[in-house]
Design a protein with these regions (language model features):
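Helix-biased detector of long, well-ordered alpha-helical tracts
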Residues: 2-381
Length: 381
């Protein structure tokens, strides 16, 4: 399958096919520690809480670019993690992510927070080694058993990644937040950056979209049980398999799709790659069950609005793209998939390899040359 070939498969049909499969469980150990609704204790949750990309860039643009011969990846291209060379054969990959809960179960929240933090290391082609926990907890407002379950859930995912949590820091806060600072390793010559996409490449997305929309439905108590189950299963899934195959299939560029949305992170990739444009085939976008229904009913995030405003004219969407898909491309993702740019034959082999390992990737577009006045990311129907 190539991105240039039209398909009759609609996102709703893809979601329907997905929903016919039995929704995987987060964990048999995921019983809540107490009868609390974590989403009712916070104003918003997950990566939808990220500082808006426009505000973040305004501040970061005033800081000096890091100049150090051992810093292989710094703050100049909005990459997923920093990379510091230790020797000719080893470099450190380091990153941090934390946020308020987007689900009600403390154990599952811990799992999602850990998977989300680990993802940045995988997106760079690295392997996680150690993590430090970051806790902001409303002492006296929530029972300590909730915190214990969060830490247990995070520990389960970190252990599954072959890494260990070796410490952390905690403070009291009116709103619950949790996350990890993660350090991993990568060979200096095998770092995969977000810049490097080439004209003619195909774009592979390794997870379905819609976590921000579905989690809004969870918070508002309008998401169906099956919709919540699929979103949860997607968010706790590690990006280790896809990340581990990046160098095998000679990925030219990669990023993980999180709070700045598919369109936002695609724009960062395209701009870091030079005069290229990403053309997204909206008919190929995989959506989590319930995404279209909830989006059509207005359950979208403030983060989506901030993403859309920041992108402005750099994002062009064809008129016949459905309203739900228009929302999905700017929807903030929590623990989303990897967006990978590869040569066509490599992309098809990469997609096939992920399918063989039980994942549901999709080739969603292609990389073209960008005229000087053109949008950076284009979504077509």
């Amino acid at each position: 399958m190539t991105a240039s070939r039209k398909s009759s498969k609609t996102p709703k049909a893809a979601a329907a096919r997905t929903s016919r499969r039995k929704a995987p469980r987060a964990s048999r150990a995921a019983a809540p520690a107490a009868k609390v609704r974590l989403t009712a204790e916070v104003s918003s949750g997950g990566c939808a809480c990220k500082l808006g990309p426009a505000d973040l860039r305004e501040v970061l643009s005033k800081l000096p670019v890091v100049r150090n011969p051992n810093v292989l990846v710094g703050n100049e291209t909005a990459d997923d993690a920093g990379v510091y060379r230790l020797s000719a054969t080893q470099a450190l990959v380091t990153t941090v992510d934390f946020f308020p809960p987007m689900v009600d179960d403390p154990y599952v929240f811990g799992q999602i927070a850990a998977a989300n933090a680990l993802s940045d290391v995988y997106a760079m082609g690295g392997k996680p080694l150690v993590a430090l926990g970051i806790v902001a907890f409303p002492t006296g407002k929530l029972p300590l058993a909730v915190l214990l379950r969060i830490l247990e859930g995070a520990g389960e995912r970190v252990k599954a990644a072959g890494a260990v949590i070796i410490g952390g820091h905690s403070l009291t806060d009116p709103e619950l937040k949790y996350g990890l600072a993660v350090t991993g390793t990568v060979h200096p010559s095998r770092v995969v950056r977000n810049g490097g996409a080439r004209v003619g490449d195909l774009l592979v997305l390794t997870k379905p979209l819609g976590t921000g929309i579905v989690c809004t439905g969870i918070k508002k108590r309008v998401a169906k049980a099956e919709e919540e189950a699929f979103a949860t299963a997607s968010m706790i899934t590690l990006n280790d398999v896809a990340g581990g195959l990046l160098t095998r299939f000679d990925a030219h560029a990669c990023t993980d799709v999180t709070g700045f949305s598919l369109a936002g992170h695609a724009t960062e990739m395209a701009e870091a790659s030079g005069r290229v444009r990403f053309e997204i085939d909206s008919s190929q976008l995989p959506l989590l069950p319930g995404t279209a229904r909830l989006a059509d009913d207005g359950y979208v995030t403030g983060g989506a609005r901030r993403n859309r405003d920041w992108l402005g004219a750099r994002l062009a969407i064809a008129r016949d793209v459905t309203p739900a898909l228009r929302e999905a491309v700017v929807d903030p993702q929590t623990s989303g998939g990897l967006l990978v740019s590869l040569a066509p034959k490599k992309a098809e082999a990469f997609e096939k390899a992920l399918h063989a390992r039980g994942l549901r990737p999709a080739i969603i577009g292609r990389v073209t040359a960008r005229p000087r006045t053109s949008a950076v990311v284009v979504a077509v129907s």
